Structure formats: C-alpha cells, structure tokens
Amino acid sequence: MKKVLFVASESVPFIKTGGLADVVGSLPKYFDKNKYDVRVMLPKYMCMKDEWKDKLSYRLHFYMDLNWRQQYVGILELQHEGITFYFIDNEYYFNGPKPYGDIAYDIEKFAFFSKAALSALPLLDFRPDIIHCHDWQTGLVPIYLDNFRYNNEFFRGIKTVITIHNLKFQGIWDKKTVMDITGLPAYYFSPDKLEAYDNANYLKGGIVYADRVTTVSSSYAEEIKTPFYGEKLEGLMQARANCLSGIVNGIDYDDFNPATDTNIARTYSVENFRKEKVKNKMALQEELGLERDPHRMMIGIVSRLTDQKGFDLIDCVMDELCQDAVQIVVLGTGDERYENMFRHFAWKYPDKVSAQIYYSEPMSHKIYASCDAFLMPSLFEPCGLSQLMSLRYGTVPIVRETGGLKDTVEAYNEYEKTGTGFSFTNYNAHEMLATVRYAEQIYYDKKRDWNKIVERGMEKDFSWKNSAKLYEELYENM
C-alpha cells in the first residue's frame, strides 16, 4: 500500500480562503482505499471554529530548532470522513484572526510549518512514500527534505509532488532574512535553487526540488511556460516541462447536488430542471428584492472580487448590459474598487442588479441553482471551480478561454448542436458583451437549444473520481 501525505495551509471543512481548501479536503477521500493510505497535515489555526478544535485529540509534542530559535511543535489528530488529519500546533505562529496575514510574518510561519511537518513524521511513525505539497506555503518541504536526507535515513527515498494552484503567489522575501529564518545552508540560496531576482522564492525552490510538478488544468500547465502567464518563472517551467502536468480539479458531487441540496428553495435534477429550476429563480428574486419575472434571464457571479477575475471588463460594459432584459446577481468580497463598483450598479439599477458584498456558502448554492447563466471573464484562471458548480446546477457558464475554463467549458456550436457554455477568446470588454448577448439570444429565441445546453452540462462528470484516478497514475509513475 502506498502512503501519501498531503501538506497544505488550508482544507475544508476546517479552514477555507479559496479553492485550495476544497482540493485538499475533498481529493483524499477519492483515492482507492485498498491501494493508498492518504493523510493530511495542516496548521492548527486559532481562528478555526471551536466545533473542530474541540474534536482534536493530542498525539505528541516536541521542540524544534528553526535556525537559532527553538520552537514548540504540538501534533493533534482527527479522523474525518475516513481520512487522518494531523494539525501542527504553535500559538506563536498560528494565533492570528485569519490563516494568512502580512507576508513578512507568513514567510516565517510557513518555514516553521514546512520543517515541523517533516520533523513530526518519525515521531508519528508514519513514513510516506510521497509527500504532496500545495502552493508556496509548502514550497520549502522538498528543500528541507533534501537537507534532512544527508543525516537521517528515515527521509531517504521519499518522493515529492508540488501542485501549483496559482503561480501568481510565490512567497517572495529578502534572501538574507529567509536564510536567517530557515536555517538552511547558503548552498540552497543560488539562482538555480531558491534565489530569484536577488530574493528568496519559496515556490521556485519547491518547483526545483520536487520530483513532479502539477497544476490544476492542462491549459494552465501550457500557459505558465509563456511570459504572459509565467509570472517570471516561465524559464523554470520550460526547464521542468518533462516533469510538469495538468490535472483538472473536481468538485464534491455530494456537497453540490441540486437533487438533494438543502440550501435551495426547490430541488431538481436533469430530468425535471425545465419545470423546477425556475422556482429557485423566483424565490431568489423575492429574497433579493429584484423584479419577480420567471422569464427574465438571470446571470450569476460568485467570486473573489479581484483584477484576476476580469471585473474591469464588466465595469466597462455594465451600463450597456443593464439595457438588456437581464438580471445580475453578485456574491463575493475583495478589492474595495470592485465592491464599490457593484454597490454602485445595484443602486443605479435596483430592479436588475443585486450586489451581495459578503460570502455565504448557502447563498452561493442559491445563486448556482437560481441563475440561468454564470459569468466568468477571468484574465487568467488556473482551474476555477465555480464553472464546474454552475454546470452541475444547470447554470450555463459564459467564460473567457483561459486555463481551466478552456478545459472544462465546451463552447456552444448552434450548427452541430454541441457545447455546454459560451466562451470568448480575447480579453476585451465588448467581445465579452457580444458573447453574453449571443447567450441571451439563444435563451430567449431558441429555448429548446438552451435547455439542451443545460442538459449536456448537467450530464458532465467533473467529480473528484476522475481527478483521483489521474493522481493515482502520477503516483504510480514516480
């Protein structure tokens, strides 16, 4: 039986800030239990909900050197849905109100976490065959592992995988400070290892030292080899091309199931969505104070409100879009500029725009279930989960062809009667508007074709089962 340890900075249901948590919390459940023993290592944040903290059981503790500092490391454990979760406890590092804070503090916090995760393994009597790291927060794990191998036989032969969920975030800080924090030999701080442009770069170090590198979609794996998407690491990604692969994320089909979802007004399935889905729309219109009209096309947006997500395009054409027979429902938080932008349009067009500037999991389910279309005009999108959720709920995605959006949404072809959504290529506001209006035309004038698009989307399988099989193949070939 192969032993695999996931090391990550967040995981559902314990702590979540983005899609990384969904991957780490969901994927381990879908591996073949007869062939894989998959466990997960996380920080024990003080901001975790008490309902989870109260369930943790103490395993052990020890003290660890972090260069000249000596730090307490506590290990707690929880069995959840058949998976063993280990939590690394240290109140000095993990006592903040949020999992992440200022990068100056996070740099030391995740150096501690990476070293502690490895140092705990001999004491836990768990020797993984593969350690699967996620994003820059665990980028030092392959480097510490390389360093530990020289003096400790326990760590020899352990392989590593690092998954890049978003190359934009790399964990970059002053090289001398990182040398002092980590206690790693100067040997590791050269341009072919941890150093990048005179700074230390955690993610770069992880990519250099990991045995395999994955991203969260095939298209994104190709895109990050180019200067536009490569975030100054395109040369490294080209050099590691033979070890680089893209595996699309999935979603938990038990959590996201319109036939059993308790968050929505009316459950439905691919067999009866034509009659039942519209009842969710009318309930949401009433809840949000929009004009009640079962025939009005409703477009949803559930997102972090940041530049990456293409909201500057929406800003350019929102006035034009609001002249059409549509309603737009927005849920999310982020940059103040975009929060205020959507508040402004909700004030200007109260019957057509609803801006919910917060995040709520039940409200997100209501939007997926109620809307007719879902808009994602991202500048770049490593994978994206929202379009998978919208397909699951029969809400037709309108996306820009980039990264995971390109891989998971097949553009509608009215002549061949194929496709699960609508897409545009260039990062251009009026190209996006033309695509939205094309979707409106099909919705209003060719309702039978629209329902077939919905049907094809609902019949697609983007569950974790498919992703887990591809990760199993990756592990077997290491």
Residue ranges and their predicted role:
Residues 1-478:
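Catalytic cores of nucleotide-sugar-dependent glycosyltransferases that transfer UDP/GDP/TDP-activated
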